[in-house]
């Protein structure tokens, strides 16, 4: 099958690799190179780099909502468009431009966690089950019919990297299965029950509320690493917690209290044991290294 691929981050790479092996990728659309590092050098997206290595034509328009881009896509000889974490809204004219429309890989149990941050919200909300869906896109926000779906049982303390990697590779496999059988698949409409929205994360959401349970805070730490990071302030400095573990111990402390010299912190329920931190503008450190340079005293109440 002849495919136009639209995607940007590392999450989309396994699918493009599979498409290159099993199908004919006619063009790739990805976000424009962005300035990175101290030298602010322009860096191509992972998808741009992969397409370049395979000599696939790459386009990086600033929008899909203009006649020039729409006409370009219509002229490309392709049967289908595959969209994964591209970063732009796809207008109706493009959704309907090819014989089989546009397919999307969405890493959640739709209609739960529709929107921009399904992986993060899955972890933050402590979900123990998820899914990867192959969806035929329509004009709504992740409201299209499901062509193929596979459920996942999640480890209790799965990290964002682990979940992303698992969903990326499963999604690639499911997409290839979908394309192989696309003429015979009966699309299934999404349920009108259980709809939730995985809104894009904000920096303010990263601030830790110590009155929440230790488990909820641990979920936030895992779901918000690397960005925006779950953080607290100490001596007017922002400190991100990159890794921790929780214990469902009963205690009598005010939430936010440092209960010993190992940086174990009382929460609304349970105790959080911090394992790795990063103070703003400094490198990440394990707890032993951190405490050698920053002395957070027992009985301190963190904000």
Swiss-Prot record:
Pfam families: Formyl_trans_C, Formyl_trans_N. (6S)-5,6,7,8-tetrahydrofolate binds at residues 108-111. GO terms for molecular function: methionyl-tRNA formyltransferase activity. The keyword Protein biosynthesis applies. One of its GO terms (cellular component) is cytosol. Belongs to the Fmt family. This is Methionyl-tRNA formyltransferase. It comes from Rickettsia prowazekii (strain Madrid E). The lineage of its organism: Bacteria, Pseudomonadati, Pseudomonadota, Alphaproteobacteria, Rickettsiales.
């Amino acid at each position: 099958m002849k495919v136009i691929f639209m995607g940007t981050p590392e999450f989309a790479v396994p699918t493009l690799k599979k498409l290159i092996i099993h199908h004919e990728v006619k063009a790739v659309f990805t976000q424009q190179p962005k300035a990175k590092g101290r030298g602010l050098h322009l860096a191509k997206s992972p998808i741009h780099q992969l397409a370049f290595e395979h000599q696939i034509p790459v386009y990086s328009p600033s929008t899909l909502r203009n006649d020039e881009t729409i006409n370009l896509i219509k002229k490309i000889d392709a049967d289908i468009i595959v969209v994964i974490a591209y970063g732009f809204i796809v207008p109706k004219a493009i959704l309907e431009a090819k014989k089989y429309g546009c397919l999307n890989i969405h890493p959640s149990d739709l209609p739960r966690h529709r929107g921009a941050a399904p992986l993060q919200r899955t972890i933050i909300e402590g979900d123990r089950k998820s899914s990867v869906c192959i969806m035929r896109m329509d004009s709504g926000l992740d409201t299209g019919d499901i062509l193929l779906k596979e459920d996942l049982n999640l480890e209790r303390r799965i990290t964002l990297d682990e979940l992303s990697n698992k969903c990326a590779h499963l999604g690639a496999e499911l997409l290839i299965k979908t394309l192989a059988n696309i003429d015979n698949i009966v699309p299934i409409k999404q349920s009108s029950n259980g709809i939730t929205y995985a809104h894009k994360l904000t920096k303010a959401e990263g601030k830790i509320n110590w009155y929440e349970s230790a488990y909820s805070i641990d979920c936030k730490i895992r779901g918000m690493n690397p960005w925006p990071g779950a953080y607290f302030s100490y001596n007017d400095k922002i400190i991100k917690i990159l890794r921790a573990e929780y214990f469902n111990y009963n205690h009598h402390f005010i939430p936010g209290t440092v209960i010993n010299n190992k940086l174990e912190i009382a929460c609304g329920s349970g105790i959080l044991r911090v394992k790795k931190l990063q103070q703003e503008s400094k490198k990440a450190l394990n707890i032993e290294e951190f405490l050698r340079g920053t002395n957070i005293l027992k009985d301190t109440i963190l904000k």
